[in-house]
C-alpha cells in the first residue's frame, strides 16, 4: 500500500493480456478500496480517467494497445493505488527521446499527486531532469548525496566519474 514498483519494461512485465483494460487498471485498487470489482466503482473510474486515457482504450484488447497506451495503463494503475513512494526501475531503458519525454510526464503526474518517485537507473542523466537529489549507494549504504542546486558542480568532461568510483 505504501510503496509501488514500476518494473523495467513495464509494458512487457506489468500488463496481463488475459485481463481486459479495466481489470488491468483496477487490480491495484483491490487492496485499497473494497468493492472495486463492482460495476458502479468501475464506472466511476472510467468516468474520471476515460477523458485522460481515451475512451477507446476500454474497448481494445490490451495486447493491441500502443506502447504509449500501455505505459499510460501502468502509470495510471499506480496513480490509482496512491502509494507514498513509487520505485521506477530503469524507466528509460531502450527509450528514444519521445518515449523518454512521455515517461518524464508520467512521473511528473505522480509527483504532482504528492508521491515520491525513486528512479533506479544505471545512467545518471536519465534521472537528473526529475531529481531533487542524487544518492550514490554502495554496499555499506549511502556514499554520497548531491542536491539539485549542486548538480552544476558535477563534471561535464567525464560525466559523474566521481560518482562511479568505489571506496
Indicate where each model-derived feature is located.
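ABC ATPase nucleotide-binding domain signature region
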Residues: 1-33
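Hydrophobic anchor residue at the start of the ABC signature
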Residues: 75
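ABC-family nucleotide-binding domains
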Residues: 89, 95-96
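Helical segment within the ABC ATPase nucleotide-binding domain
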Residues: 100-113
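Conserved H-loop
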Residues: 115-120
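A short, surface-exposed alpha-helical micro-motif characterized by mixed small hydrophobic
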Residues: 127-129
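Conserved beta-strand-loop-alpha-helix hinge in the C-terminal portion
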Residues: 141-165
Amino acid at each position: 500500500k505504501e510503496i509501488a514498483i514500476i518494473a523495467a519494461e513495464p509494458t512487457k512485465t506489468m500488463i496481463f493480456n488475459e485481463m481486459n483494460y479495466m481489470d488491468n487498471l483496477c487490480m491495484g485498487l483491490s487492496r485499497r478500496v473494497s468493492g472495486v470489482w463492482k460495476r458502479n466503482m468501475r464506472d466511476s473510474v472510467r468516468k474520471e480517467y476515460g477523458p485522460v486515457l481515451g475512451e477507446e482504450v476500454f474497448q481494445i484488447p490490451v495486447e493491441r494497445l500502443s506502447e504509449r497506451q500501455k505505459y499510460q495503463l501502468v502509470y495510471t494503475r499506480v496513480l490509482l493505488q496512491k502509494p507514498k513512494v513509487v520505485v521506477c526501475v530503469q524507466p528509460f531503458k531502450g527509450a528514444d527521446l519521445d518515449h523518454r519525454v512521455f515517461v518524464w510526464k508520467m512521473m511528473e503526474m505522480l509527483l504532482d499527486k504528492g508521491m515520491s518517485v525513486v528512479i533506479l537507473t544505471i545512467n545518471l542523466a536519465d534521472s537528473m531532469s526529475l531529481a531533487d537529489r542524487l544518492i550514490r549507494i554502495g554496499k555499506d549504504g549511502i556514499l554520497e548525496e548531491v542536491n539539485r542546486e549542486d548538480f552544476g558542480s558535477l563534471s561535464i568532461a567525464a560525466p559523474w566519474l566521481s560518482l562511479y568510483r568505489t571506496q
